[in-house]
A protein has these predicted regions:
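Sequence-level detector for tyrosine residue identity
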Residues: 5, 12, 53-54, 99, ...
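Short proline/glycine- and acidic-rich turn/helix-capping motifs at secondary-structure junctions
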Residues: 49-61, 203-208
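N-terminal, intrinsically disordered low-complexity tails/presequences enriched in Lys/Ser/Pro
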Residues: 1-13, 24-31, 38-49
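Extracytoplasmic/luminal low-complexity segments enriched in Pro/Gly and acidic/polar residues
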Residues: 126-208
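Generic structural motif
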Residues: 22-26, 51, 182-184, 203
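A short beta-strand structural signal in non-transmembrane regions
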Residues: 15-21, 177-179
Length: 208
């Protein structure tokens, strides 16, 4: 059990983990969750739902597969969850990195950091939505670049167009996040967020 394992770890260990929510969250709900989290657990990546169908339509679930995280705990994969188009899509919600300022003129809210609020979850939710739509549009506007990334069986231009159609019809929602923090911080966040799945990706010693 991953929760039990995390409880045995000292807080000088940094844990990188992928967390799955019990239900999809809107971008405003995600922003509100970040503000409720007193530990301000760093969210490294927000996974955005890009499809909503099941492989096994008769029973409404996919064929169950399993994997193991770095703790050795068995993690059920694709069990009753809608299939996602690959590659998965998402965004980094903190606005870190170096950008050319001019890019925001063509692609609104490509850069998040100057605009994020410490108190307004509605504003941040709208920014997340705009930012993600912009990221998709950047990819859609550069088909020649996408061709350099394609394997023999993929068409990324069609893929990003499909994702754009999906979020237009269904909204932008997240089914999980990747976080980095101490075991106790992650456990507190899981309780606050209603997390139902934890996949530990990496353990490192904290430098603090």
């Amino acid at each position: 059990d991953t929760v039990a394992y995390l409880k045995t770890l000292p807080d000088y260990v940094n844990v990188k983990a992928a967390l799955s929510f019990q239900k999809d969250l809107s971008m405003e709900e995600l922003a509100a969750l970040q503000m409720k989290d007193q530990n301000s657990l760093p969210i490294l990546w927000v996974a955005v739902r890009n499809a909503n169908y099941y492989r096994n339509a008769e029973i409404g679930t996919e064929t169950t597969d399993s994997s193991a995280d770095v703790t050795g705990a068995t993690v059920q994969m694709n069990d009753s969850f809608p299939v996602q188009l690959l590659p998965q899509v998402g965004f980094e919600p903190n606005g870190t990195g170096i950008y050319f300022e001019q890019i925001n003129n063509s692609y609104p809210n490509f850069e998040l950091s100057p605009h994020l609020s410490d108190t307004d979850s509605k504003k941040n939710g709208a920014l997340y939505e705009s930012h993600f739509q912009t990221l998709l549009q950047v990819m859609a506007d550069h088909p020649d670049f996408l061709k350099t990334l394609e394997s023999y069986e993929s068409n990324l231009s069609d893929y990003y167009a499909a994702v754009q159609r999906f979020i237009k019809a269904n909204g932008i929602k997240t089914y999980g996040v990747t976080v980095l923090g101490s075991p106790s911080e992650i456990l507190q966040f899981c309780e606050l967020a209603g997390v139902e799945g934890i996949f530990v990706e990496e353990l490192t010693f904290s430098r603090d």
